[in-house]
Swiss-Prot record:
Disulfide bonds: none annotated. Its main location: membrane. It is a multi-pass membrane protein. InterPro entries: DUF1328 (IPR009760). It holds the Pfam family DUF1328. This is UPF0391 membrane protein bsl6560. It is found in: Cell membrane. Keywords: Cell membrane, Membrane, Transmembrane, Transmembrane helix. The chain crosses the membrane at residues 4-24, 30-50. Belongs to the UPF0391 family. GO terms for cellular component: plasma membrane.
Amino acid sequence: MLGWVVTFLVIALIAGILGFGGIAGASIEIAKIIFFIAVVLFLVSAVVGLARGRTRI
């Protein structure tokens, strides 16, 4: 699950760079939403992983 979160985080960062750079102005809001969802999922996965005793990040 953590692998998917990291993948979506990278995709969101790329979309954010393209959107904030002016290449795709309409994707700014989508990139923001995807980025924050990815950050939340990453944090939840990290906390659950640490709570289970696994540190496989």
